Amino acid sequence: MALKPLTHPDELYQLLREGDVKEFNLRKAQLDRIKLNDCDFRYLDLRGIDAQRVDFRNCYFHNTDLRGIDLSQASLEGASFNSARISGVLFPKDIGAQEIILSVTHGTRVRYLK
């Protein structure tokens, strides 16, 4: 059974859907950890987002502009980056380059190295 991305009712998710990265970052700074797993981020421009300690597990980033984002402290298990723009993205060190290439090229879900 295929997983379908959610359109999350969370206010922080809605800010990203509306393209308000600045307000997202301001509100996120007041929180310890943000849970946005299983969400649909397809076709969004997320440049400038503070992604530290954000749970993006099982999210769809199809054709999403992620250029320059630091994802090194984000949870990305099962996320798909099909055709995403990833120039300058810092991925978690536990996700291998081949995993990222497969996800961007073929839409596979990323797995962490054990």
Which residue ranges define each predicted feature?
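Tandem repeat scaffolds
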Residues: 4, 8-114
